[in-house]
Curated annotation (Swiss-Prot):
<dbReference type="GO" id="GO:0000987">
    <property type="term" value="F:cis-regulatory region sequence-specific DNA binding"/>
</dbReference>
<dbReference type="GO" id="GO:0040029">
    <property type="term" value="P:epigenetic regulation of gene expression"/>
</dbReference>
<feature type="binding site">
    <location>
        <position position="255"/>
    </location>
    <ligand>
        <name>Fe cation</name>
    </ligand>
</feature>
<dbReference type="GO" id="GO:0033746">
    <property type="term" value="F:histone H3R2 demethylase activity"/>
</dbReference>
<protein>
    <recommendedName>
        <fullName>Arginine-specific demethylase JMJ20</fullName>
        <ecNumber>1.14.11.-</ecNumber>
    </recommendedName>
</protein>
<dbReference type="GO" id="GO:0033749">
    <property type="term" value="F:histone H4R3 demethylase activity"/>
</dbReference>
<feature type="binding site">
    <location>
        <position position="177"/>
    </location>
    <ligand>
        <name>Fe cation</name>
    </ligand>
</feature>
<comment type="similarity">
    <text>Belongs to the JARID1 histone demethylase family.</text>
</comment>
<feature type="binding site">
    <location>
        <position position="179"/>
    </location>
    <ligand>
        <name>Fe cation</name>
    </ligand>
</feature>
<dbReference type="GO" id="GO:0005634">
    <property type="term" value="C:nucleus"/>
</dbReference>
<keyword id="KW-0539">Nucleus</keyword>
<keyword id="KW-0479">Metal-binding</keyword>
<dbReference type="GO" id="GO:0010099">
    <property type="term" value="P:regulation of photomorphogenesis"/>
</dbReference>
<keyword id="KW-0408">Iron</keyword>
<keyword id="KW-0560">Oxidoreductase</keyword>
<dbReference type="GO" id="GO:0010114">
    <property type="term" value="P:response to red light"/>
</dbReference>
<comment type="function">
    <text>Histone demethylase that demethylates 'Arg-3' (H4R3me) of histone H4 with a specific activity for H4R3me2. Involved in the positive regulation of gene expression. Together with JMJ22, positively regulates seed germination by promoting the removal of repressive histone arginine methylations (e.g. H4R3me2) at GA3ox1 and GA3ox2 to trigger gibberellic acid (GA) biosynthesis.</text>
</comment>
Length: 462
C-alpha cells in the first residue's frame, strides 16, 4: 500500500524572517517550514564536514571518541522502536567506516547530549527564531525530577536536556512518531540530505489502532488494515532537506525521516507559550493512562498516587509535580524580569514593548494551563511548593532568570538588563503571594499571576 503525498513543506530564507513573523506564521499556526541560510557560520559545518561534503568521522573519533552514546539498529524492531545499543563514539565510527556488507545492520547514533557533555565546544548557536526555549533553559539550571532518589541515573542523564546530535549513514531512518512532550523541534542538517514525511495533527488518530495505544511503525511497509483501519485515509506532506537547512517541526505532527546520504544533524526539542497547551494535554492524557494501567492495585496500595507520578515521569519524561514546579519557577522568572524592566525604564522608548508583551503572554498562557490543571485535579503531593523568599534569594534561581533575560534580549534585539536585587524583588513581589509567601497549588499560582498581570498591564498599557 503506497502513501498519498498531497504537497510539499513551505521553504523560506531565514535571513528574511523576523522573530515576530516566524511566531505569527509558524509557531502560532503550528505549521512546518524549511528554513535556509541560518547555519553558514556554525563551527560544526566547518569542523564536522570533510571537503567532499561527507561527515568528518575522524574528528569525532579523535576529539569525542570516549563518549558513550545510544545507537539505533535500524534493521531491528524492538517493541515500538528500533533496537538500541550502547557504545562509544569511537566504536560507532569504526562500525560505520568498516561496514562492507549489505547484510550488516544500518546503525544510527541518536539523542547524543552533545551540548551538555561538551559545554565549552561551541558547535553552533541556536538561531533567535528558536531561542524562546523554556525547556532547555530550565534544564540548564534545574533537574526535571525533584524526587531524585526515585529515578535511576540513566533517567537523569536522558532528561538532562533536549539538545541532540544525530549521525547516520545512508539508509538510516527514524520510525513514525510525534515528538516528546508534543514539543516543537528543529532539526538542522550539518551535512547530508534527509527525506521527511509529515502527517497533519487532525489525522493523527488514523495512524493508531482502535484503542489509540499502538502507532504505525513504518509507513512504507505493508500496514495491517485490520489493526490500523484508518491508515489508508492518511494524506502526507513531504520535504527533502538539504545540507545547511533547518526544518521546524510543529507540535503533534507525526513524522518519519530517512537519511538519503551520510548525515549529521543537530536537533532540539523545545516548548514555549505557543505550544504549552499541547504539552499539558499530553501530560494529562498520559497521567490518566498511567492511572488506568495500575487501577487494580489502588485499594491495596498506600501510595497509589506516588506510584502514578513515578510511572508518569518514567514514561513521559515528567510528572504533574515536575510540571507544576517548572511552571511556578518560570512564572516567577517572568515576573522578576518584568518588575526589573518596569523599575529601570520609565518609558517604553527604553524598553522593548515586544519583550514586555512576550513576557506577559507567557504568564497569561501559564495561567490558562493552570486553570486546566485545577479543573483536572491538579497537584496532590503536599511537599510540592515554591517558597518565594527562598527562591528569590537562591543563586540557582537568579542564574535561571539571568539566562531567561539573556534569551529574550537576544530574541527582541535589546540590550541585556541587570535585574533588581533579591531584597528589592522581595519588596515588590511580596504582595502578589499569600501571607506565607508560598505557591503550594495551581490555584496559588493563578492568583499570583492574576495579581501581577493586572499591575503590569497598567504599566505597559497592554
Amino acid at each position: 500500500m503506497g502513501i498519498q503525498i498531497i504537497g510539499q513543506i513551505e521553504r523560506i530564507n531565514g535571513k528574511e524572517l523576523s522573530y515576530g513573523d516566524f511566531a505569527e506564521r509558524y509557531l502560532a499556526k503550528n505549521q512546518p517550514v524549511v528554513i535556509s541560510d541560518l547555519t553558514e557560520d556554525w563551527r560544526a559545518r566547518e569542523d564536522w564536514v570533510s571537503e567532499n561534503g561527507n561527515p568528518n568521522l575522524h574528528v569525532f573519533a579523535t576529539h569525542f571518541g570516549k563518549s558513550r552514546v545510544q545507537v539505533a539498529d535500524c534493521d531491528t524492531r524492538e517493541f515500538t522502536d528500533q533496537k538500541r545499543l550502547e557504545m562509544s563514539v569511537t566504536e560507532f565510527v569504526e562500525q560505520w567506516t568498516n561496514k562492507d556488507s549489505i547484510e550488516e545492520s544500518v546503525l544510527y547514533l541518536k539523542d547524543w547530549h552533545f551540548v551538555k557533555e561538551y559545554p565549552d565546544y561551541t558547535a553552533y548557536q541556536t538561531p533567535p527564531l528558536f531561542s524562546d526555549d523554556w525547556l532547555n533553559v530550565y534544564l540548564d539550571n534545574y533537574q526535571m525530577h525533584e524526587d531524585r532518589d526515585s529515578f535511576q541515573k540513566y533517567d537523569q542523564i536522558s532528561c538532562s536536556d533536549y539538545r541532540f546530535v544525530y549521525m547516520g549513514g545512508k539508509g538510516s531512518w527514524t520510525p513514525l512518531h510525534a515528538d516528546v512532550f508534543r514539543s516543537y523541534s528543529w532539526s538542522a542538517n550539518v551535512c547530508g540530505k534527509k527525506r521527511w514525511l509529515f502527517l497533519p495533527p487532525p489525522q493523527s488518530h488514523l495512524v493508531y489502532d482502535r484503542y489509540m495505544k499502538n502507532c504505525v511503525y513504518d509507513i512504507f511497509e505493508e500496514v495491517n488494515e485490520t489493526k490500523f483501519p484508518g491508515f489508508k485515509k492518511t494524506t502526507w506532506l513531504e520535504c527533502i532537506q538539504e545540507p545547511g537547512e533547518i526544518i521546524f517541526v510543529p507540535s503533534g505532527w507525526h513524522h518519519q525521516v530517512y537519511n538519503l546520504e551520510d548525515t549529521i544533524s543537530i536537533n532540539h526539542n523545545w516548548l514555549n507559550a505557543y505550544n504549552l497547551s499541547w504539552v499539558w494535554d499530553l501530560l494529562w492524557k498520559d497521567y490518566k493512562d498511567t492511572e488506568e494501567s495500575i487501577e487494580d492495585i489502588r485499594d491495596i496500595c498506600d501510595d497509589f498516587e506516588a506510584i502514578c507520578q513515578r510511572n508518569l515521569a518514567a514514561n513521559t519524561g515528567m510528572n504533574l509535580n515536575d510540571f507544576f514546579l517548572f511552571m511556578s519557577r518560570f512564572s516567577l522568572g517572568n515576573m522578576v524580569l518584568l518588575q526589573s524592566y518596569s523599575d529601570k525604564h520609565k518609558n517604553l522608548n527604553s524598553c522593548s514593548l515586544a519583550m514586555a508583551q512576550n513576557l506577559l503572554m507567557n504568564l497569561s498562557t501559564i495561567l490558562k494551563v493552570m486553570m486546566k490543571m485545577i479543573s483536572a485535579g491538579g497537584v496532590t503531593a503536599e511537599e510540592v511548593y515554591l517558597d518565594l523568599r527562598e527562591t528569590l534569594e537562591d543563586p540557582q534561581f537568579l542564574r535561571f532568570v539571568r539566562d531567561m533575560g539573556r534569551t529574550y534580549a537576544r530574541i527582541h534585539m535589546e540590550e541585556e538588563d541587570q535585574f533588581l536585587s533579591s531584597k528589592e524583588l522581595l519588596q515588590k513581589l511580596s504582595g502578589l503571594a499569600g501571607p506565607n509567601m508560598q505557591i503550594c497549588s495551581p490555584k496559588d499560582l493563578v492568583e499570583m499571576i492574576n495579581h501581577h498581570n493586572t499591575f503590569s498591564s497598567q504599566i505597559y498599557f497592554i
